[in-house]
Amino acid sequence: TGSGNTPQLPKICMELGRGIKGLIGHTQPRRLAARTVANRIAEELKTEPGGCIGYKVRFSDHVSDNTMVKLMTDGILLAEIQQDRLLMQYDTIIIDEAHERSLNIDFLLGYLKELLPRRPDLKIIITSATIDPERFSRHFNNAPIIEVSGRTYPVEVRYRPIVEEADDTERDQLQAIFDAVDELSQESPGDILIFMSGEREIRDTADALNKLNLRHTEILPLYARLSNSEQNRVFQSHSGRRIVLATNVAETSLTVPGIKYVID
């Protein structure tokens, strides 16, 4: 994890001659991740999204006749099977974040195993940070396992229970977040990432933090239903401190730059 394999794998496939007889399909569990990864690969190749690097998510299709790598959600690939049972438009398929084991991902893994005997030319790559690789290898008839070393950094963990054992008064989650933000405001500069369970919780917390009028601090929500421009704000350069409130999309599917502190 953290090795940068998500944007690099499709480029390696292209260098090996894949993506010519068919597309290199690359699935992500979330729309935001699919779009962000496509933009990142296009940027590294000094091209625009929609050219040789395209993406397709619900309500947005940026794939052209020149596209070689197609980022998409796993739901899009699953839907395409209805019209293209042999997935003939692809010569390579990368299933990313397989450890999430969603219904879509599990259906795809089962279907692709059944498909491979009929499509011996099709290359399947399953990637993940945390899955049991031997188990997935056995599922695909003892497929080879390639391990990529991740990058780790020293982490200090501070436990701040919402309910103190010696104190009967119970803080709510919002107050616990305020206290944590206040504690981190005494530390050296760096952006804060707060993990939350869903959109409503994020909106309510963002409203509450904005009312505190924290100096030189920008509050940024990050969830699937935000517009593209609002989501892209987390990747833009900025001054001062940022507090990003996100679902677990920021845990595995994409990297938010500048984060030094995490409140979970």
Regions found by a protein language model. Name each.
Residues 1-264:
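P-loop NTPase motor module signature
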